[in-house]
UniProtKB/Swiss-Prot annotation:
GO molecular function, one term: pyridoxal phosphate binding
GO BP annotations listed: amino acid metabolic process; cell division; defense response; ethylene biosynthetic process; phloem or xylem histogenesis; response to auxin; response to jasmonic acid; response to mechanical stimulus
Lineage of origin: Eukaryota, Viridiplantae, Streptophyta, Embryophyta, Tracheophyta
Induction: Down-regulated by partial submergence. Induced in leaves by infection with the fungal pathogen Magnaporthe oryzae. Induced by phosphate deficency.
General function of this protein: Catalyzes the formation of 1-aminocyclopropane-1-carboxylate, a direct precursor of ethylene in higher plants. Involved in defense response by producing ethylene after pathogen infection. Involved in several phosphate deficiency-induced adaptive responses, such as lateral root elongation.
Other comment: Lines with ACS2 transgene under the control of a strong pathogen-inducible promoter show significantly increased levels of endogenous ethylene and defense gene expression in response to pathogen infection, and exhibit increased resistance to Magnaporthe oryzae and Ralstonia solanacearum.
Name this protein carries in UniProt: 1-aminocyclopropane-1-carboxylate synthase 2
The reaction(s) this protein catalyses: S-adenosyl-L-methionine = 1-aminocyclopropane-1-carboxylate + S-methyl-5'-thioadenosine + H(+)
Keyword Zinc-finger found: no
CDD domains: AAT_like
EC number: 4.4.1.14
Pathway: Alkene biosynthesis; ethylene biosynthesis via S-adenosyl-L-methionine; ethylene from S-adenosyl-L-methionine: step 1/2
Residue numbers carrying N6-(pyridoxal phosphate)lysine: K275
């Protein structure tokens, strides 16, 4: 979009390197202009591009009703209003940092411990990622990221910091698992280009794959980081959204139990309450670094994106309720697995598969056989049909830097059951129509090939052509028998 007066702005503001020109964001625009509503707009676009967990918000609402003292805006909690309304230290409320550290350990099954003094707040995981980018690298330096990866990393990590993200190419033949060979290849390739590699960024569990990184791979990454003196940033915002085996393993557990000799100054964790707790509107992001200098610098930078004291106060009380948190995590897991099963089984009914996942709020859907050809252009062509005709905002794999065309991320935890059934119905209709068109096209091609393969008989008379024997070879025994 062209704006008037853009020539009066800074290069940063007027530039086009914000990362939002991706098809990932284009699908959101289609939804925003025509959003689906069960009662008022059933023909609208269904939002399946938003990784949001709305399945268990009722549990948080119930807790809030039963604990009015957790809010400073109720008669039960108003006595704390003045304290919370006044200026607070950038470190955050001590009770919030303590509760958050406790919660992070509980989410990881008590297999890792977290120090409240290392908890740094940020306005969501977006701010946390950017803060780490500013802390760990200079403009022009790079982080290696396994593909496919979250499209907004290009904005969050690069736009204002000036760093680069370089792909570690992963492939479907091994379910997109990260290997040491792929990591070394990406690292050496960057070095040959004269690019300084400052770190590795992974999402565990993976967005968009919905899979976890296993213990051995995490140990390999920590070892590689130590040997090559590069940072390892683990985005663990879906750590509490693992709903099936294998069990989740955090980098915090690995460096405590498996590679205690690694250089902890190079290890950093990003966390948030947006996904596991379904509270993206609260804008709570966390940096947890084992590096004292990073903690100090990140705290100074946190003044640009603090979490409100009122939010901290409320969450400190809720996260400290270990019994409730335990029940919430268990019930959330049950609801996530039920939704995942319903969606993937619904796809199987029309022959559509997904990468086998056990975490997250989405599925990695395989539509490769529906492509006109195996190209990124064909994938985007199919995606446009899905968004604008089927009216489902799904995200194409190319927007996640996936090199294999035909994969799509589909979010299914951000809607109620009835909307999910409408979405599945649209997918069923679309796939069946596509199958019918393909069958017709194959029949037409076969008939055309048959016609082309038949001999030409321009020299025969119309009377001869009307004979049942007209299309037989003159040397046929049946023709000779009638002559």
């Amino acid at each position: 979009m062209a704006y008037q007066g853009i020539d009066l702005l800074s290069t940063k503001a007027a530039g086009d390197d914000h990362g939002e020109n991706s098809s990932y964001f284009d699908g959101w625009k289609a939804y925003d202009t025509n959003p689906f509503d069960l009662r008022h707009n059933r023909g609208g676009v269904i939002q399946m591009g938003l990784a949001e967990n709305q399945l268990s918000l009722d549990l948080i609402e119930e807790w809030s009703k039963n604990h009015p003292e957790a809010s400073i805006c109720t008669p039960e909690g108003v006595s704390q209003f003045k304290r919370i309304a006044n200026f607070q230290d950038y470190h955050g409320l001590p009770e919030f940092r303590k509760a958050m550290a406790q919660f992070m350990g509980q989410v990881r099954g008590g297999k890792a411990t977290f120090d409240p003094d290392r908890v740094v707040m940020s306005g969501g995981a977006t701010g946390a990622q950017e803060t780490l980018a500013f802390c760990l690298a200079n403009p022009g330096e790079a982080f290696l990221v396994p593909t496919p990866y979250y499209p907004a990393f290009d904005r969050d990590c690069c736009w204002r910091s000036g760093i680069k993200l370089l792909p570690i190419e992963c492939h479907s033949f091994n379910d997109f698992r990260l290997t040491k060979e792929a990591l070394v290849s990406a690292y050496d390739g960057a070095r040959r280009q004269g690019i300084s590699v400052k770190g590795i960024l992974i999402t565990n569990p993976s967005n968009p794959l919905g899979t976890i990184t296993d213990r051995d791979t995490l140990a390999m990454l920590a070892t590689f980081a130590t040997e090559h003196r590069v940072h390892l940033v683990c985005d663990e915002i879906y750590a509490g959204s693992v709903f099936a085996t294998p069990e989740y393993v955090s980098i915090a557990e690995v460096i405590e139990r498996d590679v205690p000799w690694c250089n902890r100054d190079l290890i950093h964790v990003v966390y948030s309450l947006s996904k596991d707790f379904g509270l993206p509107g609260f804008r709570v992001g966390i940096i947890y670094s084992y590096n004292d200098a990073v903690v100090a610098a990140a705290r100074r930078m946190s003044s640009f994106g603090l979490v409100s004291s009122q939010t901290q106060y409320f969450l400190a009380r809720m996260l400290s309720d270990e019994e409730f948190i335990g029940r919430f995590l268990q019930e959330s897991k049950c609801r996530l697995v039920a939704r995942h099963e319903r969606f993937t089984s619904g796809l199987r009914e029309v022959g559509i598969g997904c990468l086998r996942g056990n975490a997250g709020l989405f599925s990695w859907m395989d539509l490769r056989r529906m492509l006109r050809e195996k190209t990124a252009e064909a994938e985007l062509e199919l995606w446009r049909v899905i968004v604008h005709q089927v009216k489902l905002n799904v995200s194409p794999g190319t927007s996640f830097h996936c090199r294999e065309p035909g994969w799509f991320r589909v979010c299914h935890a951000n809607m109620d059951d009835e909307t999910m059934e409408v979405a599945l119905g649209r997918i069923h209709d679309f796939v069946r129509q596509h199958q019918q068109r393909r069958v017709k096209a194959e029949r037409w091609a076969a008939n055309r090939q048959l016609r082309l393969s038949l001999p030409h008989h321009h020299h025969l008379s119309p009377a001869h052509l009307s004979s049942p024997l007209a299309l037989l070879s003159p040397q046929s025994p049946m023709v000779r028998a009638t002559s």
